[in-house]
Amino acid sequence: MAKTLYQKLFDAHVVHEAPNETPLLYIDRHLVHEVTSPQAFDGLRAHGRPVRQPRKTFATMDHNVSTQTKDINASGEMARIQMQELIKNCNEFGVELYDLNHPYQGIVHVMGPEQGITLPGMTIVCGDSHTATHGAFGALAFGIGTSEVEHVLATQTLKQGRAKTMKIEVNGRAAPGITAKDIVLAIIGKTGSAGGTGYVVEFCGDAIRALSMEGRMTLCNMAIEMGAKAGLVAPDETTFNYVKGRLHAPKGQDFDEAVAYWKTLKTDDGAQFDAVVTLNAEEIAPQVTWGTNPGQVIAVSDAIPDPASFADPVERASAEKALAYMGLKPGVPLTDVAIDKVFIGSCTNSRIEDLRAAAEIARGRKVAPGVQALVVPGSGPVKAQAEAEGLDKIFIEAGFEWRLPGCSMCLAMNNDRLNPGERCASTSNRNFEGRQGRGGRTHLVSPAMAAAAAVTGRFADIRSLK
């Protein structure tokens, strides 16, 4: 029987399955951070259990770390406790930890792929909803809760039901300057923020194949924002070339044998999906969200929509509520909307290609008066690479703040946050009420679009910036 990529990955990891029971899956990699792990380790301790596979478990600090100092005390008491607990737990249970002083420390979903911990064909979990990022490698990756974190630590397995399958095909060639972020926002604009609920999504088509691994990670990172369980891109030469030579990747003959297997990880001809969505990449413009979910998104050249234009009464009410919170009026061109802050970073867009794209716009320009702009590299290696290329100097000269790695202003769990009423052009993944700080207004954009907003003080079409 012809199978989809998701079905192949799922079936390859079933440990036990019985009638009327949820299948038990083997987990190849478990990524851990300071926020969702303390109670899980406490549970192990209470029952006298070890970590079943410490060598398949990797930890880092990211969510509530300061991006201005490596001082563990800088983000407040709760953050300090969580980070100290992670150090203690990793030492006690023999788990590898990239702490604040480790050169590999960074956002968990940047660190995993960078170190070759993430590989095609794997099952990967983490107590974090954006674990879907790793699906870019043709791995089945999804977020789990703290009780499940404990279960995986104790058993290296997880009960998991089968999801429905959705194919999202993006054909044609994207115009210059159109990034994976624009593509995925356009997809969510079409499906809505709940359009993928109950599905695992496979992204395919010419425009997806043309993306780098970093672009594919951006794409899969936001699969969760359309409600999907996970996102997948079938591995190909782009994937193999990215993985080769990384710290935890197979070496020599082992690598060649792995690639031979990885090449089988694709949807068979004739395999049936439960749903299919198609887009034409040539029609995708730079995207900007205007509301309080990622599906409330338009092209930068458009105007704020009128809630009355929505036929669905639920969508209409949602739009009215969103505009009230966002302080926007229908009919106003997006390019007339001024911003207060800019955030370039997060597990969506903090990799080297993202920083290069932003620096290209920032080069020779200045951050607009009254705007605070942060650039937060996703990991120690990304920061080092950017500095080796001189990107930090471009940003600093333009008036951006060059920070230390961490989740930063993506979520209000550290010192980087919005004040009530402040408007932010952000390269992160969520724009719901209060996500970046109580009363903060978030607009999701690509790194180049964020840099353009920083230097113009409002949303600007990068296609017209010379």
Curated annotation (Swiss-Prot):
The entry's keywords: 4Fe-4S, Amino-acid biosynthesis, Branched-chain amino acid biosynthesis, Iron, Iron-sulfur, Leucine biosynthesis, Lyase, Metal-binding
PROSITE patterns given in the database record: ACONITASE_1 (PS00450), ACONITASE_2 (PS01244)
GO MF, any single term: 4 iron, 4 sulfur cluster binding
Pathway of action: Amino-acid biosynthesis; L-leucine biosynthesis; L-leucine from 3-methyl-2-oxobutanoate: step 2/4
Note on how the cofactor is bound: Binds 1 [4Fe-4S] cluster per subunit.
Catalyzed reactions: (2R,3S)-3-isopropylmalate = (2S)-2-isopropylmalate
An annotated GO BP: L-leucine biosynthetic process
Alphabetized InterPro entries for the sequence: 3-IsopropMal_deHydase_lsu (IPR004430), Acnase/IPM_dHydase_lsu_aba_1/3 (IPR015931), Acoase/IPM_deHydtase_lsu_aba (IPR001030), Aconitase_4Fe-4S_BS (IPR018136), Aconitase_4Fe-4S_dom (IPR036008), IPM_dehydratase_rel_enz (IPR050067), IPMI_cat (IPR033941)
Binding site for [4Fe-4S] cluster: 347, 407, 410
EC number(s) reported in the record: 4.2.1.33
Keyword Cytoplasm: no
Required cofactor names: [4Fe-4S] cluster
SUPFAM superfamilies on file: Aconitase iron-sulfur domain (SSF53732)
Function: Catalyzes the isomerization between 2-isopropylmalate and 3-isopropylmalate, via the formation of 2-isopropylmaleate.
Subunit structure comment from the entry: Heterodimer of LeuC and LeuD.
HAMAP family per the UniProt record, alphabetical: LeuC_type1 (MF_01026)
Name the UniProt record assigns to this protein: 3-isopropylmalate dehydratase large subunit
Record organism: Cronobacter sakazakii (strain ATCC BAA-894) (Enterobacter sakazakii)
